[in-house]
Amino acid sequence: MRISLRCFPAGMLTCVLFVVALCPQPAQADSPLNSTDFHQAYLDLPEVRKAAQARVLDDALADYILSPGTSYDEAAAVINALGWDTEGKDNHVRLLRRLKVTDRRAFDRFKTGKGSSRVLFAVGYLWAMDDYFETRRAEALLWQARRQAPEFFAIALIHALVVAQSEDVGRWCDVFRGPRDTLARYPNGLEMRRSAVKVVLDYTDIYADECK
């Protein structure tokens, strides 16, 4: 049985995440995160191309992800392009270090559980990609971001992907339903490129038969 992190108040939740960051957790589910390279739909953007080549977050990419002028889908594409590694990565830590330098107030607000939707989204998705074997902490941050900014499809879809990643073995139907249900909740248009959404659905739809 999975313990829902939604029962924690926002401030307490983020504090808990900082405390348990180094605690090992069991690996779960399939690999929706490392099987959906939707950044391919954004390779016209120089930041995405740079991320795909470097695979490591630098200050310029961190600033781009955190900038209010960067749309959520483009920030997500950069994070997706940075990729994953079976040995783990530390890009979410790099982003927080950069945030601490460039906007100490935003960093402190995040640390005390009052982070903006952009910071929550960026740290959450980076953390999920950095440690895709254990995504519950990242899932909690993305849920907070989604609650703060429910109008953005990109946040909702990434959250659904991370939830799918952390589903218990045997709940494959939920891997299919999560992204599809998310898509259905945004009938009036998506701010994410359709070709990027297709990459995600092409993977998660392979589990459709598990819902029969």
Protein language model annotation of sequence segments:
Residues 31-44, 67-90, 114-130, 153-167, ...:
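Amphipathic alpha-helical repeat scaffolds of TPR domains
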Residues 147-153:
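Structural alpha-beta junctions
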Residues 23-29:
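Sec/Tat signal peptide C-region and signal peptidase I cleavage site
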Residues 9-23:
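Bacterial N-terminal signal peptides
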Residues 55-64, 91-111, 135-147, 170-187:
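Alpha-helical repeat scaffolds
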Residues 29-61:
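N-terminal alpha-helical scaffold/docking segments in eukaryotic complex subunits
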Residues 118-122, 136-140, 150:
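Short, well-structured alpha-helical interface segments that form or flank functional binding sites
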Residues 1-8:
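N-terminal secretory signal peptides that target proteins for export/translocation
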